[in-house]
């Protein structure tokens, strides 16, 4: 039987993407929790270039970067496909995955920065949400009729954005401003709950990093 290990963090959206894909494929794996303040020799050895999680170790071979790992899992293991079969649809899925990956940083900066940097990040986040809201006007998934590669990569905009909003009191996505995006997010979280980490645990984790907005100011 193939040996599969995943170096990651339980509350990281990047690790979560990989766990989700492994569960879709029905792959048994060992999860090794990392401490990013005290990185293990295994992590440093497995990802000597970036020294970041997640890292998938499959039969002693190391694969880094969550989007690269997702494609590897789809090709290396049997089970339901994560990427579409049609070449055009595959290209489309990769396009949207790259878009949300590139633009998603602004969402995180909206909660983890201050002052002018935070305001600029919010504007960039609103622009991304506007584009996604338009994209989900007539569909529930990025490509086709089932959640797949691009949707998994968009977990930061779906699941984790809601967590950050609840913890911080800063709300970026409202149904008044972005009704289609919010409908997609609701469906996303309902349909894929079995693949998600504990919401309560995520709230506890992120409350340790984010101070809520003081509404009295």
From Swiss-Prot:
Keywords: Pathogenesis-related protein, Plant defense, Transferase. Its EC number is 2.5.1.18. Induction: By fungal infection. It catalyses: RX + glutathione = an S-substituted glutathione + a halide anion + H(+). Residues 2-81 form the GST N-terminal domain. One of its GO terms (cellular component) is cytoplasm. Gene3D superfamilies: 1.20.1050.10, Glutaredoxin (3.40.30.10). Residues 86-210 form the GST C-terminal domain. GO terms for molecular function: glutathione transferase activity. SUPFAM superfamilies: GST C-terminal domain-like, Thioredoxin-like. It is an enzyme of class 2 (transferase). It holds the Pfam family GST_C. Glutathione binds at residues 12, 39, 53, 65-66. GO terms for biological process: defense response; glutathione metabolic process. Belongs to the GST superfamily. HSP26 family. This is Probable glutathione S-transferase. It comes from Solanum tuberosum (Potato). The lineage of its organism: Eukaryota, Viridiplantae, Streptophyta, Embryophyta, Tracheophyta.
């Amino acid at each position: 039987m193939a040996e599969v290990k995943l170096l990651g963090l339980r509350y990281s959206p990047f690790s979560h993407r990989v766990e989700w894909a492994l569960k879709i494929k029905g792959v048994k794996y060992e999860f090794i929790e990392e401490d990013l303040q005290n990185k293990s020799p295994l992590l440093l050895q497995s990802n000597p270039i970036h020294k970041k999680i997640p890292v998938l170790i499959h039969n002693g071979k190391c694969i880094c970067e969550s989007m690269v790992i997702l494609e590897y899992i789809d090709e290396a293991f049997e089970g339901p496909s994560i990427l579409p079969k049609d070449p055009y649809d595959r290209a489309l899925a990769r396009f949207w995955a790259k878009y949300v990956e590139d633009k998603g940083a602004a969402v995180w900066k909206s909660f983890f920065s201050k002052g002018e940097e935070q305001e600029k990040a919010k504007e960039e986040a609103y622009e991304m949400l506007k584009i996604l809201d338009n994209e989900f006007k007539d569909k529930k998934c990025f490509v086709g009729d089932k959640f797949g590669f691009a949707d998994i990569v968009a977990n930061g905009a779906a699941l984790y954005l809601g967590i950050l909003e609840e913890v911080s009191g800063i709300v970026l996505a409202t149904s008044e401003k972005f009704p289609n995006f919010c409908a997609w997010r609701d469906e996303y979280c309902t349909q894929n709950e079995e693949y998600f980490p504990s919401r309560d645990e995520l709230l506890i984790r992120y409350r340790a990093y984010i101070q809520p907005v003081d509404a009295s100011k």
